[in-house]
C-alpha cells in the first residue's frame, strides 16, 4: 500500500514536470514571436529561460518545482513590460496563441499541484500510522513535503 501511495506522489510530480516543460516550450515560442518587436529584450529573456530551465522528475524537490515556476513568472513579468512598450505584439496571432497556451498550461499546473498535494496528504498520513510507520522506516519511506499553491498569471 505504501509503495502504491509513493508511486502516486512520484506520478503527480512527474505530471507537474510535464506541465512545466510544456509551459516553458510555449513561453519560448511566444518569446520567439516577440523578437520581431524587440530583439534585444526577447533574446535576453530567451537566454534566461534556457539558462534556468531544468527538467522536473519524480526525484525533484518541491523547492526545484517552485524555482522553475518563479522563473517562468519572472520572465512573464518582463515580457509584460515589453508588451506595454510594444502593444502591437498582441496583434500577432501566433504570439497570442502561444500566450494562451502558457496560461492554459498554468491552469493545468495548478490542478496538478492540487493532485500532488492530495497524494502527499494520503501518503504522509499512511506513513505516520502504526504499523505502517514501522514498515515505512524499514523501506526508507519518509514524509513528503507539500507544494505551495502555484498562482499562474
Residue ranges of each PLM-predicted region?
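A helix-centric hydrophobic-segment signal that preferentially recognizes long
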Residues: 1-153
Amino acid at each position: 500500500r505504501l509503495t502504491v501511495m509513493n508511486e502516486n506522489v512520484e506520478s503527480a510530480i512527474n505530471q507537474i514536470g510535464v506541465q512545466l516543460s510544456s509551459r516553458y516550450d510555449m513561453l519560448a515560442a511566444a518569446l520567439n514571436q516577440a523578437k520581431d518587436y524587440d530583439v534585444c529584450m526577447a533574446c535576453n529573456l530567451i537566454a534566461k529561460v534556457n539558462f534556468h530551465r531544468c527538467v522536473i522528475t519524480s526525484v525533484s524537490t518541491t523547492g526545484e518545482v517552485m524555482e522553475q515556476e518563479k522563473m517562468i513568472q519572472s520572465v512573464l513579468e518582463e515580457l509584460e513590460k515589453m508588451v506595454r512598450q510594444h502593444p502591437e505584439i498582441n496583434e500577432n496571432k501566433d504570439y497570442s496563441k502561444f500566450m494562451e497556451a502558457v496560461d492554459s498550461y498554468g491552469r493545468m499546473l495548478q490542478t496538478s499541484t492540487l493532485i500532488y498535494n492530495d497524494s502527499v496528504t494520503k501518503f504522509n498520513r499512511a506513513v505516520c500510522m502504526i504499523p505502517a510507520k514501522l514498515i515505512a522506516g524499514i523501506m526508507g519511506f519518509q514524509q513528503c513535503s507539500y507544494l505551495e499553491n502555484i498562482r499562474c498569471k
